[in-house]
Amino acid sequence: MAANVGDQRAADWSSQYSMVTGNSRENGMETPMHENPEWEKARQALASISKAGATSSSKASSSGPVASAQYVSQAEASALQQQQQQYYQWYQQYNYAYPYSYYYPMSMYQSYGSPSQYGMASSYGSATAQQPSAPQHQGTLNQPPVPGMDESMAYQASPQQLPAAQPPQPSNSQHGTHSLSNGPQPGTAPSTQHSQAGAPTGQAYGPHSYSEPAKPKKGQQLWTRMKPAPGTGGLKFNIQKRPFAVTSQSFSSNSEGQHSSFGPQPNSENTQNRSGPSGRGNLSGKPDDWPQDMKEYVERCFTACESEEDKDRTEKLLKEVLQARLQDGSAYTIDWSREPLPGLTREPVAESPKKKRWEAPSSLHPSRGAGSVTRGGGAQSQRGTPGAGGAGRARGSSFTKFGNRNVFMKDNSSSSSTDSRSRSSSRSPTRHFRRSDSHSDSDSSYSGNECHPVGRRNPPPKGRGGRGAHMDRGRGRAQRGKRHDLAPTKRSRKKMAALECEDPERELKKQKRAARFQHGHSRRLRLEPLVLQMSNLESSGADPDWQELQIVGTCPDITKHYLRLTCAPDPSTVRPVAVLKKSLCMVKSHWKEKQDYAFACEQMKSIRQDLTVQGIRTEFTVEVYETHARIALEKGDHEEFNQCQTQLKSLYAENLAGNVGEFTAYRILYYIFTKNSGDITTELAYLTREMKADPCVAHALALRAAWALGNYHRFFRLYCHAPCMSGYLVDKFADRERKAALKAMIKTYVALHSAAFCAVALPRPLRILVSLQLLCWSPLPVPCS
């Protein structure tokens, strides 16, 4: 009955599933199951096997290729299927027939003798033996125990011979392809080929023995006994495993004589460096491995140093010398007791160009950052910096310190970044000022934000206020009761100086700061006048500098409308000097005849514009501005008068002939009108003796004195006798002074004052009225004026 059931089950499964040949089962690799020509023979053998088929099948596995396929009974298959569902139920949703081999190197190659992926027959017979090629090797893999299975199950591989006509296997990497199966067959799809491409470059894999005796199997393998679930057909997902990261450590063969297929063998170069005496001189070696006389030589070098600068130079020289000696192996052969000490010169060592943070440090020529690291770590730890025990002791145990210096630091970016993170993330209550191990020469090579120079220039940052505002945010309880002294004493300054980070470029920075004050005042005078470009006229109120745009006009028109320039002037619209003289004569005659101020002012401004555009500053220019000032003064336009008298002042400063005295007096009177005492004082200071003798200037000075003293009687007497056109300017502020005079007279009136004396400050129509009002109070007759 069991044979019939097994025969029926084998007949049902033969049309759906493939089988695993003896080769793939021997190697322990999982291959897709396809229909085999030997299936009919195996089915007939299974029908004749009783319940002890497991024992007979194990005996038949060594007889030939017909009995190489092993099967289990129906009861055992169902029990294994239940066990699979119990332990590997997570992977059944992907129709994965076998347990997910995360930790088991499963092969994706098909074995010889089985049909290809697309049902094509293999070109190699199943009974043909294979001989692995030179770069390929295989070995016994020690698999961890599978849950629920016997721990003593063996996983062995048997050597087979390849035919002579086999094509060579291509290699996808620079080292040998690690074939975990008997090799891919030619008909296999490219997706089923696998190569160890994740191994690091430069690792050599030694040959393994292929004559290793096979161990007797203690039980059938899990992937041999387990069958796919019914209904899944030939579907199978090749889920890629996580890449196996091969480290640089060498896995030696175990004591049982089994060879590991993953263990990289050390290359000959590394072996020589480790074995010979020169191998001890490797740059990554510790100073503890140095010869004793070499250590004494380093101590003598640092003992001879007198200052920190000497130690810096000695440290740099020793690094270059000792690294070269350790590299060529002469450090263990020379007599260090007779080796001369490196010469120390007082000149500062030329600074090497700064290196970027992301540049890898050179092994033969260490950068300046390495030296700064040793000073930051070694010197401070020996000086007794508080709180420098954690990282300082850790580094002190790895390197031997000579004269407050670590002569060698291993240029390892990974270790330096780890040390920097560990130091910056420490929660010690005191602030450590220590450089990080990042080998860069920049000024910001401190560990995080922890290293700030302590002193008067950089006080500690203040908080927002309130309780604990003097503390740094994020510190522990041990610092809450402490306050930062704003004015440190002499003793505290010495302690702070010991905590300061030593900057290797301190002297260079001092020289740069001193160089800024060697050339006197840093402000330099502008060599050329600041010119406003025409294409960048953003401020509409500022006039362009016409000195850079001097042109010669060609316009013959005597009259021209005044238009404000918004672009470069056109010579065809500008009148030359000859035409401008005719235009000035026309404006004078027109003003005398018609007194049309609007026309006269427009034409005078147009003439001034043409003179400015052409850069003409001659006596004719002075005449134009004086004429326009007189017309504006006569009409009472003090704005235009102010513009004209300002230009006349600059023209007179160029020693151009004109009515200098007259317009100087007008300027003084204009300052009295605006009550600009500062400009009045300046103008009086620049008056010469000859200028003061001018009648107009003398009158203006007398009027200014009466106005300043509040002598209104004298002020109005001078106002009545104003020369030239000074009266037009006094008219602008005469009413203001009359009111002030009346207030003064009302406050200080005495009957002894005559009406005629008081009437002087009044205009002529009011003199009679005031005289009549004052007659009733005055005992004396009023004299006729």
From Swiss-Prot:
Q: Which spans does this entry mark as compositional bias, Low complexity? A: 47-64, 413-428
Task: List residues modified as Phosphoserine.
Answer: S352
Give residue spans, biased composition: Basic and acidic residues. 32-43
Quote the biased-composition stretches of kind Polar residues, using this chain's numbering. 13-26, 119-143, 175-198, 246-276
- Provide the residue span(s) of the region labelled Disordered: 1-64, 119-292, 336-507
PROSITE patterns to which the protein is assigned, alphabetical: PCI
Q: Which residues carry this modification: N-acetylalanine?
A: A2
Q: Which domain of life is it from?
A: Eukaryota
- Which InterPro entries does the entry link to? PCI_dom, SAC3/GANP/THP3, SAC3/GANP/THP3_conserved
Q: Which UniProt keywords apply?
A: Acetylation, Phosphoprotein
Pfam families of this UniProt entry? Answer: SAC3_GANP
Boundaries of each PCI domain copy?
637-785
The record, for PANTHER family, names: 80 KDA MCM3-ASSOCIATED PROTEIN, LEUKOCYTE RECEPTOR CLUSTER MEMBER 8
User: Can you state the subunit structure given in the record?
Assistant: May be part of a SEM1-containing complex.
Provide the protein name: Leukocyte receptor cluster member 8 homolog
Whose protein is this, by species? Mus musculus (Mouse)
